[in-house]
Amino acid sequence: MRTVLVALLALVALTQAISPLDLIKEEWHTYKLQHRKNYANEVEERFRMKIFNENRHKIAKHNQLFAQGKVSYKLGLNKYADMLHHEFKETMNGYNHTLRQLMRERTGLVGATYIPPAHVTVPKSVDWREHGAVTGVKDQGHCGSCWAFSSTGALEGQHFRKAGVLVSLSEQNLVDCSTKYGNNGCNGGLMDNAFRYIKDNGGIDTEKSYPYEGIDDSCHFNKATIGATDTGFVDIPEGDEEKMKKAVATMGPVSVAIDASHESFQLYSEGVYNEPECDEQNLDHGVLVVGYGTDESGMDYWLVKNSWGTTWGEQGYIKMARNQNNQCGIATASSYPTV
C-alpha cells in the first residue's frame, strides 16, 4: 500500500513539473506530425510555432463562445494554423471578382439567365453526395486555383446527371490551358471563364490522364482523354438565395464565389459558419455548393465543398449560413455549366 502511495505521489509531482511550455511543445510536435510539416530551418520553425501558438489562443477563446452557445461554429488547429492570415489569403484565395466585372463590361459575355422551373416544390434539404454526383474532396495545395476546382466540381455533377457516370476532371488542364480566356493559373481565375474554355476547346481531360501538379505548367491537353464537355453556362440572378436553392435542388452542384478573407474561415472546423463581418462583394474564393439544409438548432445552411483537402473543416466541407442576406456573397456570382 505504501509503495502504491509513493508511486501516486511521484506521478502527481511529475505532472506538476510539466510546464505550460512543455505542453505547447508537445502539442506543436503532434501538429507537425499530423500535418507532415517540415520547415527550412530552425528560424522558420520558431516563427511558425509562434504563429501556431497565437492561433491556438484565438481558437480556444472562440470555442469557449461556441460552448456557451454564442457562436454557431468551431475553429480548429488545421494545417493552416501555422500561417499568417495575409500569407494564407495571398496563397489560397484565387477568385478575382474585379476581373469578373471588368470582363463582363469589356466583352459583354455572360451566361444564360437561370429561370427556375414553375410549379416545382423543392425539398427542405439536398445533398448531391448522396446521389453520387460529387467526387472526393481535392486539395489545391499552395496554388490559387480554387476557381478550377469549383469549375470541375460543377461540370462533374452535370456530366453525372446526364451520363450517369461520375468522372473526376482535370483542374490542371484548366490551370495550364485557359489563360487566353482570362484565367491566370495559380494566380487566380473565374469559373465562367473555365466553362467558356471547355466549350470552345471541345472538352476537358480526365484527372487521371492530366493529374494535378499545383503549379503553372505548359498546356498538354489531349483530346483522346476528354472526360466531359459543356455547351455553355447559366448565371443565377445575383444575390438571390431562393433561386440558387432551386437551382441546386433541380440542376445539381453550383459553382459559387465567396468572401473567405477572414481568419475564422481559415481556421474553420465544424458547425454553421455565420460571419457577420463577411462582405457580399469582396469575393476571393471559388467553391462548390453541393446541397443545403437546416441544422438541429434551426439554422439554415449551404453545404459547400472546398478544395483544401479533408483535414480542413468537416472532412473538407463547410456549412455556410443560408438566408442571412446573402452572407459572404455566396449567391453573388453563382453559375453552373450546361451539358
Swiss-Prot record:
Principal location listed in the UniProt entry: other
Disulfide bonds: 143-186, 177-219, 278-328
One GO MF term: cysteine-type endopeptidase activity
Active site: 146, 285, 306
KW Protease (keyword) present: yes
A GO biological-process term: cell differentiation
Catalytic reactions of this protein: Specificity close to that of papain. As compared to cathepsin B, cathepsin L exhibits higher activity toward protein substrates, but has little activity on Z-Arg-Arg-NHMec, and no peptidyl-dipeptidase activity
Subcellular localization, as worded in the UniProt entry: Lysosome
Residues that carry a glycan: 96
CDD domains: Peptidase_C1A
InterPro entries noted in UniProt: Papain-like_cys_pep_sf (IPR038765), Pept_asp_AS (IPR025661), Pept_cys_AS (IPR000169), Pept_his_AS (IPR025660), Peptidase_C1A (IPR013128), Peptidase_C1A_C (IPR000668), Peptidase_C1A_papain-like (IPR039417), Prot_inhib_I29 (IPR013201)
A Pfam family this chain is assigned to: Peptidase_C1
Source taxon at top rank: Eukaryota
Propeptide: 18-121, 295-298
Protein EC: 3.4.22.15
Record SMART domains: Inhibitor_I29 (SM00848), Pept_C1 (SM00645)
Family per similarity comment: Belongs to the peptidase C1 family.
Role played: Important for the overall degradation of proteins in lysosomes. Required for differentiation of imaginal disks.
Name under which the protein is recorded: Cathepsin L
